[in-house]
Amino acid sequence: MKKAVNVETNNFDTSLKEQILAVKNAGFQGVFFDWADTEEFKEIVEFTRATGLEIASIHAPFDHVCDMWNEEKPEIFHKLIKCINDCGSLNIKTLVCHVYIGFDTVAKVTDIGIKNFSLLIDEAEKYDLNLAFENTEGVECLYGIKEHLSHRKNCGFCIDTGHEFCYNAGYDLLKDFCDKLFFLHINDNMGVTGDRVFWTDDSHIIPFKHGKVNWQRFTSNLKSINWNSWISLELCVKNKPNKHTHDDLIGVPCEAFYNMAFEAAKRIEGNVND
């Protein structure tokens, strides 16, 4: 299986290009990063491909994405359309999208929301671009997408292991979404550490370190669904506010970080293949 990892502008005090080269040198075959409505985004895509790395996916913007369930074509809708157009024109194959954001509101599936997301899929189909809808808080809306839209060829899902652990306890998302699983965000965390579910627990730790995700269960589940696509890690290198999950990475250069990440990816692959 091919292996990929994310790069982010705020992960290190180095450029995205330097991080991408470190990813390549660590042994990964692919990389993924956020879309931006800039010429630099297109330049980074071209640079990545010139190194020989594949663009495993791109991450769509998700600010105010909960408005998709309450308004007809809200501002975020138009931003997502622009993102789809850019990715399609650059021959990106997979775009990861959130369907909800917010910890102080109740997720509710609505007709207008299904219509908005259906229109996004319409646009993606023009480019044969796969939309991989990701589990976050408000997982009820993800199940709404599955119920109403998963019959569409370009509608599928991205399962984030860390989100499942700290946001979606009690769900078996790989089992529920395996029929249309397009991508993975593999990462670890400490679970819910406070008195409520909150984004600061979404640590994105390298697997097999000090997080609490059950990796034996995860790799067993991957094996059971015959997963043979990307082993893709979505990681952070810095602490969330008032957290200390990444203290061990303070001062670690990006080359060493991506070497550690690649070893974790190989271990996951090995466990799946056992």
Protein language model features and the residues they cover:
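Aromatic/hydrophobic pocket-lining residues that form π-stacking "cages" and hydrophobic walls in ligand
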Residues: 19, 44, 83, 120, ...
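A cross-domain feature marking catalytic cores of carbohydrate-active enzymes
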Residues: 7-9, 33-37, 57-62, 97-99, ...
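Active-site acidic/histidine proton-transfer and metal-coordination neighborhood
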Residues: 49, 69-157, 166
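Histidine-acidic metal/acid-base catalytic patches
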Residues: 1-4, 9, 13-24, 92, ...
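Alpha-helical scaffolding within the catalytic cores
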Residues: 39-43, 79, 169-172, 217
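Alpha-helix-loop-beta-strand connector modules within alpha/beta enzyme cores
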Residues: 47-63, 114-127, 213-220
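Acidic-and-aromatic substrate-binding clefts and catalytic sites of carbohydrate-active enzymes
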Residues: 10-15, 30-43, 64-74, 102-106, ...
